């Protein structure tokens, strides 16, 4: 009696489907390539790449606390002063240079150093496009008749004797003339000061500075984009003695991220060539008639065609595109050959019969459950990622899931038809390459017969069985597994968290070098962070309320991670000394205060309602102790102070986006991995409905992924959205190894361990090798993003082999009872007089 389970339903469906394909192969060979060609043609004729310019937001979740705070800050206080309103970084245009002194004294403020600074500044100011675009014509101005918005040091460097003009500016962190303040904290790097000469505002004369940063803030226009492109192409050629030049711009990170994809393109043809050669070689044998090189070639062709069709369809539908997607073809094409090895193994295991058509149908039906499981688990692991909160994860996983869907559809149609013709060629005794020529099959001598039954994989499987079967060996495997698990968990616990912007660009990128220099040279003072206080329910006419607000301002800036910078109420109270007002008198006094220099800038720090009442106000703080290690403590301290105050509001800094992203990433990784494992386990239970075996599958999947995370941590990979994609991907990949092993174990009645190893050793080794070869060439690409994917694939492959051929078979043979047996689906075949369609490949 046939077993009524999901596996038998899948097998029966493929029996009927393969019957149609084998009898009428021509339509299935023609239609998929025509469909692919049609999709590509539609895409090319209406080509438009839907890419986003919000580089940082691509790697942020759709909704998180700091992102909501940023949107409210932008709504209530639209940026008007690019030097003060630094939260406008997402929309502003700028370039900047950093010149670091490499001489023995390490002081860029020496006479020769200032001359080098002046030459660099004049070089940047002198850059001009063929259309006449330059800094002067594109710089940001507060008013049309005013000079460019630049630090006074820029004007000093244009002087004929800049070394004298600059001397008047050398105080740190600020230079103060009465009520006029010049911010030097972001200009001078690695500063040494004269602490004994500190003034009452905490500013000291600069004794030396190793580096100087010059920022050029620009208007948003097409001419600005052209000039920035000119700057980025010209500045790498600029050289200065005893100096190192760093540079960046508002579009640099986006352009360098795109270069990750560009670095992959030259490797695509080489990877395809290597995989084609490997697959054709793996499908060949010493028996020339049984060699199937074209099956290997068309397996690669099928995977490539599916990748092209799926990508073209998504582009035609205007689905977003990211440079990260360039990694997808390498993964999909590599795993696309796995099913081919299973199908070929099944074909070679079937006995010769009078009805060769039925023989092929039987071979395909026998491997149908495994084929379906491979595609379903890989596809679902990416499908889970395609509903992620992160834009980059969602886009990448959608492209991968769509490619796997097309690959499965083309596999059961196009590739099945091609393989049926190749098998007919083998049965008719034609040449494997020159199919028109018949060849005389070699005489089936005793040596050849022994060779056909005992190939390399069979020898490996038999030796593996002899090693694993004795009880002492099983105990040894158990302790090896415990050591593996302990080491993996130890490293996984220490996995560094959070996105490091330096790693988004290629290793040799000028952006990575500039970000590293920024952390090294300008770590003491950073940009501004902000606090927003909603004022609907408070009355500022009350001096106690004003005093409490100033107290909040002092508390927020009272840690080692931030210091007070500007708050309009501070000078207002110093002027009015806690005076009590009526509502109208306070309003008049405030407007008088804001109407005169140097308080005009505070107009942008107060939001008024249509009725003239204060709706919200903004405080500014200077960020201290730059670096990712201090971002989380800063966010925690400032948010806690705001929450414990009596006022309604929030604090915001650009680094808070990365802090929140870090916490959201951890949560999403846990949710996605658990969801993926539960989904995979549900599918595996459907395919192998046996409780103990299902428990072994779940344990093995979890073990593989713990090992992958531990291995990633050991190679200094961070838990960010890049590794998040790869971890979710590894869940689907790991299922392929452990479930096939379990399935082929439970369908055996006796000698289960040996038969399972004999069946699974060759496909596991071949598919693992093809997957590893497919991405191995990418190890030469110097990019953290690419390196993370390559490492993950290698780890999954290595641990998959370890579990699929050693840990899991031993576990199954030890704890799965003989009663937990599953009857495999037996297809309906015409030659009932010989129902045993399988050769005795086990040698038992």
From Swiss-Prot:
Gene Ontology cellular-component terms for this entry are:
cytoplasmic vesicle membrane; plasma membrane
Q: What is the lineage of its organism?
A: Eukaryota, Metazoa, Ecdysozoa, Nematoda, Chromadorea
Q: Which GO terms describe its biological process?
A: endocytosis; molting cycle, collagen and cuticulin-based cuticle
Q: What is the protein's name according to its record?
A: Patched-related protein 9
Instruction: Specify the species.
Output: Caenorhabditis elegans
Q: Which family does it belong to?
A: Belongs to the patched family.
In this protein, which residues make up the domain named SSD? 264-421
Q: Which residues form a coiled coil?
A: none
**A UniProt-annotated Pfam family:** Sterol-sensing
């Amino acid at each position: 009696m046939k077993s009524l389970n999901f596996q038998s339903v899948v097998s029966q469906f493929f029996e009927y489907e393969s019957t149609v394909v084998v009898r009428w192969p021509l339509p299935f060979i023609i239609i998929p390539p025509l469909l692919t060609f049609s999709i590509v043609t539609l895409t090319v004729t209406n080509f438009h790449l839907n890419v986003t310019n919000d580089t940082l937001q691509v790697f942020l979740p759709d909704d998180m606390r700091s992102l909501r705070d940023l949107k409210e800050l932008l709504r209530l206080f639209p940026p008007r002063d690019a030097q003060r309103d630094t939260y406008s970084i997402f929309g502003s245009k700028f370039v900047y240079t950093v010149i670091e002194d490499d001489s023995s004294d390490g002081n860029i403020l020496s006479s020769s150093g200032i001359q080098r600074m002046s030459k660099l500044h004049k070089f940047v100011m002198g850059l001009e496009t063929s259309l006449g675009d330059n800094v002067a014509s594109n710089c940001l101005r507060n008013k049309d008749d005013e000079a460019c918005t630049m630090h006074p040091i820029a004007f000093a460097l244009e002087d004929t004797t800049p070394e004298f003009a600059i001397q008047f500016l050398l105080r740190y962190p600020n230079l103060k003339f009465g009520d006029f303040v010049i911010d030097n904290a972001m200009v001078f790097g690695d500063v040494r000061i004269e602490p004994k000469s500190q003034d009452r505002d905490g500013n000291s004369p600069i004794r030396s500075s190793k580096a100087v940063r010059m920022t050029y803030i620009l208007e948003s226009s097409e001419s600005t984009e052209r000039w920035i492109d000119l700057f980025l192409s010209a500045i790498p050629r600029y050289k200065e003695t005893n100096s190192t030049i760093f540079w960046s711009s508002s579009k640099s990170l986006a352009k360098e991220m795109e270069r990750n994809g560009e670095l992959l393109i030259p490797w695509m043809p080489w990877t395809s060539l290597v995989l084609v050669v490997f697959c054709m070689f793996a499908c060949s044998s010493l028996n020339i008639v049984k060699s199937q090189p074209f099956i290997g070639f068309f397996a690669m062709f099928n995977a490539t065609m599916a990748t092209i069709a799926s990508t073209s369809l998504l582009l035609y539908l205007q689905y977003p595109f990211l440079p990260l997607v360039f990694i997808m073809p390498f993964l999909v094409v590599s795993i696309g050959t796995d099913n081919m090895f299973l199908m070929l193994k099944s074909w070679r295991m079937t006995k010769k019969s009078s009805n060769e058509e039925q023989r092929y149908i039987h071979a395909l039906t026998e491997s149908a459950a495994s084929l379906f499981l491979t595609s379903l688990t890989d596809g679902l692991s990416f499908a889970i990622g395609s509903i992620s909160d992160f834009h980059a994860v969602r886009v990448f996983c959608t492209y991968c899931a769509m490619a796997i869907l097309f690959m499965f559809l083309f596999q059961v149609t196009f590739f099945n038809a091609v393989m049926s013709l190749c098998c007919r060629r083998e049965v008719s005794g034609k040449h494997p390459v020159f199919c028109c020529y018949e060849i005389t099959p070699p005489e089936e001598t005793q040596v050849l017969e022994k060779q056909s039954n005992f190939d390399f994989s069979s020898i490996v499987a038999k030796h593996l069985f002899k090693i694993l079967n004795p009880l002492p060996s099983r105990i040894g495997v158990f302790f090896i597994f415990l050591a593996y698990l302990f080491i993996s968990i130890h490293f996984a616990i220490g996995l560094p968290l959070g996105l490091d912007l330096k790693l988004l660009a290629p290793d040799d990128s000028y952006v990575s070098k500039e970000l590293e220099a920024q952390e090294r040279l300008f770590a003491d003072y950073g940009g501004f962070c902000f606090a927003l206080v909603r004022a609907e329910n408070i009355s500022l006419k009350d001096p106690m309320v004003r005093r409490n607000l100033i107290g909040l301002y002092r508390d927020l800036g009272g840690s080692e991670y931030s210091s007070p910078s500007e708050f309009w109420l501070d000078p207002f109270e110093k002027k009015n000394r806690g005076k009590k007002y009526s509502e109208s008198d306070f309003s008049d006094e405030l407007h008088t205060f804001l109407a005169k220099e140097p308080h005009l800038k505070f107009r942008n720090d107060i939001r008024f309602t249509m009725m003239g009442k204060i709706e919200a106000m903004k405080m500014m703080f200077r960020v201290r102790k730059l670096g990712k290690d201090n971002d989380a403590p800063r966010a925690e301290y400032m948010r806690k102070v705001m929450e414990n105050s009596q006022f309604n509001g929030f604090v915001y800094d650009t680094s808070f986006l990365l802090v929140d992203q870090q916490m959201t990433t951890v949560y999403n990784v846990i949710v996605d991995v658990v969801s993926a494992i539960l989904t995979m386990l549900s599918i595996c239970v459907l395919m192998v409905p046996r409780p103990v075996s299902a428990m072994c599958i779940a344990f093995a999947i979890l073990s593989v992924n713990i090992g992958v995370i531990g291995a990633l941590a050991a190679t200094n990979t961070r838990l960010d959205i890049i590794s998040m994609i790869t971890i979710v991907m590894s869940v689907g990949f790991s299922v392929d190894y452990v479930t096939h092993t379990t399935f082929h174990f439970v369908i055996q009645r006796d000698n289960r361990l040996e038969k399972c190893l004999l069946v699974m050793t060759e496909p596991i080794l071949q598919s693992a090798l093809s997957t590893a070869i497919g991405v191995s060439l990418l190890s030469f690409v110097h990019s953290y993003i690419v390196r993370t994917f390559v490492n993950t694939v290698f780890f999954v492959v290595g641990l998959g082999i370890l579990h699929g051929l050693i840990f899991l078979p031993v576990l199954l043979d030890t704890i799965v009872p003989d009663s937990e047996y599953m009857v495999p689906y037996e297809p309906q075949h015409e030659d009932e007089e010989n129902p045993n369609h399988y050769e005795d490949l086990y040698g038992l």
